[in-house]
């Protein structure tokens, strides 16, 4: 079960109108079938987990001794225009909250978000992780949803999600009507992130492996890489209390980290 105990939600932590009480009622009602979600249940049309990669992950490499692994997804809206948003390294699909809120309420769209293998509500098989493997995982979800028509999906990927998107375009090019790539790269031995970003990734992953450090410190480092310092230090133009963007964003990231723990 989750370990989050905050009395109120930080603004922007979950769907518009969400309360701690509503989220807890949903958790209690679903019992053993519960998977943490920040998205609006009012726009939810389908969700996982589903079994994927049964032909690629042998039983001795899965968490439960069966071929493949359980992959979590949520589909919001029921419109004819299909959108999929792919998240980056070590982040859950919760990061697409604003996009799901916006497009999920629009009757023209169906919007798909998912947790990549190894993070969030998705299993972590004991095997090599590659962008081609991630791409095939997403393709399995498409197959499950029936998103197989030519030029029927608009693809969006950020950071590592952009790399997965590029791999999907290479392997399944006929599926996509468009591709939007955010803060990403096509890959190259000499095309590395800035030293600051590399240092953050190495330190954070190392701390998680050995159980050192704190979520708060890791999240602070992530914010310093994701956002410009001048923006973090600036007063938010929409906050009535005059807080900085850092003061508003940090509690959201920390709350989501705690909330996502099952």
What are these regions (language model features)?
Residues 190, 215-262:
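Conserved alpha/beta-hydrolase catalytic His-Asp/Glu region
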Residues 85-88, 159, 184:
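Glycine-rich His-Gly loop
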């Amino acid at each position: 079960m989750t370990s989050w105990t905050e009395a109120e939600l930080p603004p922007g932590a979950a769907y518009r109108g969400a309360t701690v009480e509503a989220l807890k009622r949903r958790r209690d009602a679903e019992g053993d079938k519960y998977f943490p979600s920040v998205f609006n249940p009012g726009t939810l049309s389908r969700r996982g987990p589903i079994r994927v990669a049964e032909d690629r992950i042998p039983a001795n490499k899965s968490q439960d001794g069966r071929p493949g692994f359980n992959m979590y997804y949520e589909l919001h809206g029921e419109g004819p225009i299909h959108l999929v948003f792919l998240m980056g390294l070590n982040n859950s699909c919760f990061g697409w909250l604003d996009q799901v809120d916006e497009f999920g309420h629009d009757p023209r769209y169906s919007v798909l978000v998912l947790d990549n293998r190894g993070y969030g509500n998705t299993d972590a098989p004991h095997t090599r992780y590659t962008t081609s493997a991630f791409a095939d995982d997403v393709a399995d979800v498409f197959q499950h949803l029936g998103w197989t028509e030519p030029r029927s999906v608009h693809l969006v990927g950020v950071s590592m999600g952009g790399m997965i998107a590029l791999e999907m375009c290479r392997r399944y090019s006929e599926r996509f009507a468009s591709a939007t790539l955010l803060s990403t790269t096509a890959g190259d031995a000499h095309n590395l992130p800035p030293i600051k970003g590399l240092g953050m990734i190495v330190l954070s992953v190392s701390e998680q492996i050995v159980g050192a450090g704190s979520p708060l410190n890791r999240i602070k480092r992530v914010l310093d890489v994701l956002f410009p310092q001048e923006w973090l230090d600036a007063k938010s133009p929409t906050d009535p209390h005059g807080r900085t963007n850092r003061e508003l964003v940090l509690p959201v990231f920390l709350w989501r980290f705690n909330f996502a723990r099952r």
